[in-house]
Amino acid sequence: MAFIIRAQNVSFCYSEGESKSPPVLKDINLQFEKGQFIGIIGHNGSGKSTLAKHFNALLLPTKGNVYVKDMDTKDAKHLWDIRQTAGLVFQNPDNQIVAAIVEEDVAFGPENLGIPPEEIRKRVEYALKAVGMWEYKDFPPHMLSGGQKQRVAIAGIIAMKPECIVLDEPTAMLDPIGRREVISTIKKLNKEEGITVILITHFMEEVVDADRVIVMDDGKVVLDGTPKEVFKEVEVLKKIGLDVPQVTELAHQLRKEGIDIPSDILTIEEMVEFICR
């Protein structure tokens, strides 16, 4: 089985020595298969964003190891290969966009890799078409909506030809329309392009279609399974301050009222199918 990322006994503190801070990550053990769509959820301060930054060596474990395609992130000679394998998209697209024109921004990463101009042009066209932004290639980024900017930021990562994209709360600053645009793009890249997607989010509905959902609390993994397996644990999720998808919450309340309804219903379609039986 091909694991694109492995975390072994990973713990992390932001400061050590005399002023050592409490651990933000505590003995994390995870393995991600190539081609999966993985959602990582948790409330603010759970450690999910800190963990995301370990997946492309932006942060290094205080204890334990992270491997990207068997390359140890602590080994400096692998740094560029790791970051080309696992691209990171940040919460605020304005922090990731560096050029005055969309096309130039997407070309920035490949140019830094020393890729020939003709290949860069092909990559830019491919990346912008993949996220549905090719028609905006000549636009200045400040003329775009928040969702469009985030799609350009994702295109900039795609142009590097990563095998995995890690997205750290990419929809947190977007309106509902922008969120739908970005999530639709992410799903398309995973299903049609085979890119491994690791989505960090606090919007439960965004990971309903994931292959796997990981729930974090206080720097630890507390749940790990398919969306159905995770979201049926309504009381566990509520105890750590998380909501569940609205349809799952409805099913949970109906069960409490004595109605025999499956606890793992996630979508409106599943609810309608059950009611119509």
Swiss-Prot record:
Q: Name one Pfam family in it.
A: ABC_tran
Tell me which UniProt keywords the record has, alphabetically. Answer: ATP-binding, Cell membrane, Membrane, Nucleotide-binding, Translocase, Transport
EC number(s) from the headed UniProt entry? 7.-.-.-
Q: Which GO terms describe its cellular component?
A: ATP-binding cassette (ABC) transporter complex
Family the UniProt entry places it in: Belongs to the ABC transporter superfamily. Energy-coupling factor EcfA family.
PANTHER family membership: ENERGY-COUPLING FACTOR TRANSPORTER ATP-BINDING PROTEIN ECFA1 (PTHR43553:SF24), HEAVY METAL TRANSPORTER (PTHR43553)
Per its record, how is this protein called by name?
Energy-coupling factor transporter ATP-binding protein EcfA1
Which species does the entry assign this protein to?
Caldanaerobacter subterraneus subsp. tengcongensis (strain DSM 15242 / JCM 11007 / NBRC 100824 / MB4) (Thermoanaerobacter tengcongensis)
